[in-house]
């Protein structure tokens, strides 16, 4: 046992020296403390610590660090309400905190992120998967955009993958490529070792999946590199300390602008806390929920009066797709279709007036009763003539 211990220590020293040498060549710095944090990250994900010396991984680090550092900084600075919440849920659910970086890789922590494959939200769920995990998706809400509910769903899903494959890094790979493809890759490789599965020459897994795990590890390493964080912004070191929102009951069929006004909040800020609402009002039917800043909870409990809030029409308008042409503006398009700039912005989740040629916009269409009458009259006339 003592011999094994000394061999392990000697082996880790050799790896550390290798990394120091490589980092010296590429002008990176590695301290014993940072090296140990890297080892801890690998162990948390059930990855053999020797993977840190994998040549393909080491060679990819310089490029991945420079390419994905902005993702980390943006995620920390612009989503300071989301990252602490996710970390808290991960800790409560007793899963590796490094799973946070899966979300960063998937969506950059953007609740309104939509992939080419129509995966939505922080955790990039497809509709069938999301519904199977208990998330509500209908004409009024899309809980894939709710960072709290979707995080619990993602953790549940990842736990099931961990139970199926036995190791956390395999669960991460399966999250990206699917259970079937990972099982097939393991069978072809004759091993579930990470170094073997993401071998760039053997190509047991797609390039996307091979890069997926490398990106997660790169972001996890960067987030634990105090020198890197201090160099960018000293405040980033304590980014996990703020968690400033709470879940409260929301009345049904009420305009979001009225809720925001009642809470002394501007509408844009209220929407940032509640990205799961699809329209400018809460869903009809039984009560729902919303998120508010923690410092508003006492005010909410004392002053919030549901009976003072007017109910609004929650009928979902008919829509059409409009392709932007040269010379178009939101005002011109809104006037053409007898709607408002605000409605077009709301439906398309756009904040500015700038449009691009060939950009696709969802436009609300108001039903024209006279047009319907004329159409029916024409149909009746045609039927008479046909007889």
Where are the language model's segments positioned?
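Short, functionally critical alpha-helical segments immediately adjacent to catalytic or ligand/cofactor-binding
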Residues: 95-112, 171-176, 271-274, 344-348, ...
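An acidic, Gly/Ser/Thr/Pro-rich helix-cap/linker signature
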Residues: 2, 11-13, 23-94, 99
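Extracytoplasmic low-complexity/disordered linkers and repeat tracts associated with LysM-containing
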Residues: 221-251, 262, 267-387
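Substrate-binding clefts and substrate-entry loops adjacent to catalytic sites
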Residues: 60-74, 109-116, 124-166, 191-203, ...
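Solvent-exposed, polar/charged alpha-helical surfaces in well-ordered, non-transmembrane soluble domains
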Residues: 77, 81-84, 88, 100, ...
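Solvent-exposed, acidic/flexible segments
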Residues: 72-83, 92-95, 115-123, 143-154, ...
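Amphipathic alpha-helical blocks and their helix-capping loop/short-beta junctions
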Residues: 202-227
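Catalytic and binding regions of secreted/periplasmic enzymes and modules that target cell-wall glycans
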Residues: 158-188
